[in-house]
Amino acid sequence: MKRGSEEIKEETSPLPAKHFQRREVSIAEDIGIPIDLMVEILKKLPAKSLIKFQCVSKQWSSIIGSSRDFIDSIVTRSLSQPSRDILISFSTTLTNSLKQISSSFPLRTLDILTKNQSYTEAAIYNPTTRQSLSLPETTAGHSHVSTSFLGYDPFKNQYKVICLDNYKRRCCHVFTLGDAIRKWRKIQYNFGLYFPLLPPVCIKGTIYYQAKQYGSTYVLLCFDVISEKFDQVEAPKTMMDHRYTLINYQGKLGFMCCQNRVEIWVMKNDEKKQEWSKIFFYEMAGFEKWHIARATPSGEIVFVNRLLLSCQTLYVYYYGPKRNSMRRVEVEGTKYRRKHLVHICPVPDHVENTMRL
């Protein structure tokens, strides 16, 4: 019996590890897939699969997360698909919960999130890769409250974070994502007396936002992401009497008021003249409790609840101003048994982007 067991043991014993290593190398060499063909195969895969496949090898990780041509192809593919909305809910019972503080640019690939209640610590977040990057402190420090905008330079293909000091320092800093220096740059800012208001909107490389000086009316300011210069935009006086919501309305800057009425103004695409036209006005109460997420390419306005109990059903509403019609879409998988108040944070028109932060 002992002899027989020894014979069986010899027959079932594993092969040496070195033999397996040689075999793996030979299989890879036998396949011999050209790098160009491999890249084309990867481009056909869903973004979720690409994020997982980054751990296959350093080469795959570099292609998926760092190759400019590959990332652009993923963005282009996502843009050709029907637009999608991502809704992120944050519990108000958690003191250290993240909150969205900027969603300015049209290509919804990245967001700025604040890490604390005083909005002094911010991070860039990529919903596709679920990766975040903490922003360094500015030279002014974090002893005061600041406002951050996220913009996109379409010519240099760069993302930039603009940080405005809201109080005494009256300065502005710019952080370029992907810059090897990883430091803030101080630039000239001549509108320090105005308090910037969120959310902004970025259209064709220009960030637009409303601002207010204490005891005065509102103003409309803009920041050119390419030249990194600020300017004031002329707007009708009736629009500056109270706060509006800025939207990208079919490629044009839009002002929308939703209090006891629905009012939409659109700025004409004319660099020499800043002319506005009121495209819709309708008396309707009840819209003040909603959050304006965006405008669809067809001109529909997307609304979501500002606050909601976790046990309640979450709905997204699409309002068509031209037909004065409303449709409702239920969001599944958002209800919880435990009751607590949640803050709804919409990420409109999300575009997949595998860029590594």
Swiss-Prot record:
<dbReference type="InterPro" id="IPR036047">
    <property type="entry name" value="F-box-like_dom_sf"/>
</dbReference>
<dbReference type="Pfam" id="PF00646">
    <property type="entry name" value="F-box"/>
</dbReference>
<dbReference type="InterPro" id="IPR001810">
    <property type="entry name" value="F-box_dom"/>
</dbReference>
<feature type="domain" description="F-box">
    <location>
        <begin position="27"/>
        <end position="73"/>
    </location>
</feature>
<dbReference type="Pfam" id="PF08268">
    <property type="entry name" value="FBA_3"/>
</dbReference>
<dbReference type="InterPro" id="IPR013187">
    <property type="entry name" value="F-box-assoc_dom_typ3"/>
</dbReference>
<protein>
    <recommendedName>
        <fullName>Putative F-box protein At5g50220</fullName>
    </recommendedName>
</protein>
<dbReference type="InterPro" id="IPR017451">
    <property type="entry name" value="F-box-assoc_interact_dom"/>
</dbReference>
